[in-house]
């Protein structure tokens, strides 16, 4: 069975790049978004869920099949997807794996504790073309690995 690509599309800067690559390899793309981020893109199916804490995440997890590719920057969602045998990339092309997810979840927890105590943590920088290029390269490599294309 061909993998599908599921995108946690709320605030995702690489939706268009994902659709272009998926089309090249004949893969289906599904965008999962909540009502605050309604989007429709040619070449992708869009599922819109009610706005609410993690409702898009739970919908995405319910759609995941072993071997699917998921695009998200959410560590909690990534952990759930890993347990179902999915492959996860973030918007910068970094892979979330069983080997690195615990450390990522711990750093998220520490950051939350700092913010809760009144501290500040560094926010994201302005997105660059290099980040987009790195994502496209990583997604294509992952697709080729899964489809066993040399």
Please tell me what each predicted stretch does:
Residues 2-150:
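Nuclease catalytic cores that cleave nucleic-acid phosphodiester bonds
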């Amino acid at each position: 069975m061909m993998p599908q690509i599921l995108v946690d599309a709320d605030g995702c800067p690489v939706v268009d790049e994902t659709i272009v690559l998926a089309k090249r390899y004949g893969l289906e793309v599904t965008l999962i978004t909540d009502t605050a981020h309604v989007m429709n893109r040619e070449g992708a199916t869009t599922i819109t869920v009610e706005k609410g804490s993690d409702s898009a995440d739970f919908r995405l997890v319910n759609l995941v099949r072993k071997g699917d590719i998921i695009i998200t920057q959410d560590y909690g969602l990534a952990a759930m997807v890993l347990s179902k045998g999915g492959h996860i990339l973030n918007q910068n092309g970094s892979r979330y794996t069983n080997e690195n997810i615990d450390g990522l979840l711990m750093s998220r927890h520490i950051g939350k504790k700092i913010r809760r105590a009144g501290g500040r943590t560094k926010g994201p920088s302005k997105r660059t073309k290099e980040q987009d290029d790195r994502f496209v390269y990583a997604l294509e490599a992952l697709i080729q690995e899964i489809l066993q294309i040399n």
